[in-house]
């Protein structure tokens, strides 16, 4: 029997290279952003003007801090998303397997965060007068607000990428995120460099993060894979 994670990578091999799968052809992927409006998404705790569409791009003002979520839950899937920060030190991310709501007293939801930080963040947020840890801008994976997971390249509870592949302000970055049976593997600009496993949540919502500065998104697509053995405790409650 082919396990779902093996299936996911077998699929990549059959379809071709990362660029071929995610950049040049749909290959069964479904668009999550139509380039015209916010169909398929719901604001959780942001303002009416936080998320807008301009010239076919999804534009996030960064204010206030919060998220918008997908209307649908996802379990096993491959997510393709392209992003660029418009301000030095910008902060954002995408949550997978999220509960899709924000508890009282918090600004962000429970979920697995796939970090998106602009490269100057470590210079703006110095530690003891020196640039902060490079892991922050590497495309880290970590459980947020109660989600537990095991990092494959640990930096505390976070998993940092093994190579620094993110591009800076005004440049487009490409994330391909494979999420199967509690394991998340991240490709940054065409190369798999990070992973985390044993997630306590394995089915939930996608959330896009607004956190202080303008960020643009485009080409948000998803390929759903066969379901796994996911328990009720590992599944987010449906939001009606």
Predicted regions span which residues?
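Bacterial N-terminal signal peptides
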Residues: 8-17
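Positively charged n-region of N-terminal signal peptides that target proteins for export
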Residues: 1-6
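Carbohydrate-interacting regions of secretory-pathway proteins
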Residues: 22-240
């Amino acid at each position: 029997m082919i396990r779902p994670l093996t299936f996911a990578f077998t699929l990549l091999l059959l379809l071709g290279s990362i660029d071929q799968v995610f950049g040049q052809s749909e290959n069964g992927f479904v668009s999550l952003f139509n380039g015209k409006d916010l169909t398929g998404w719901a604001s959780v705790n942001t303002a009416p003007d936080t998320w807008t569409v301009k010239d076919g791009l999804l534009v996030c003002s960064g204010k206030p801090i919060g998220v918008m979520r997908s209307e649908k839950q996802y379990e096993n899937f491959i997510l393709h998303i392209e992003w660029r920060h418009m301000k030095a030190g910008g902060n954002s991310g995408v949550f997978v397997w999220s509960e899709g709501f924000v508890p009282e007293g918090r600004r962000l939801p429970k979920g697995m965060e796939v970090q998106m930080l602009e490269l100057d963040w470590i210079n703006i947020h110095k530690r003891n007068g020196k640039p902060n840890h490079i892991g922050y801008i590497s495309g880290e994976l970590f459980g947020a607000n109660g989600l537990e997971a095991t990092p494959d390249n640990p930096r505390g509870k976070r998993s940092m990428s093994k190579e620094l592949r993110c591009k800076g302000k005004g440049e487009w970055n490409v994330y391909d995120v494979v999420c199967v049976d509690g394991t998340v593997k991240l490709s940054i600009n065409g190369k798999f460099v990070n992973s985390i496993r044993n997630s306590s949540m394995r089915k939930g919502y996608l959330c896009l993060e607004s956190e202080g500065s303008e960020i643009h998104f485009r080409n948000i697509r998803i390929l759903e894979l066969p379901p796994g053995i996911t328990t009720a405790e590992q599944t987010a409650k449906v939001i009606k």
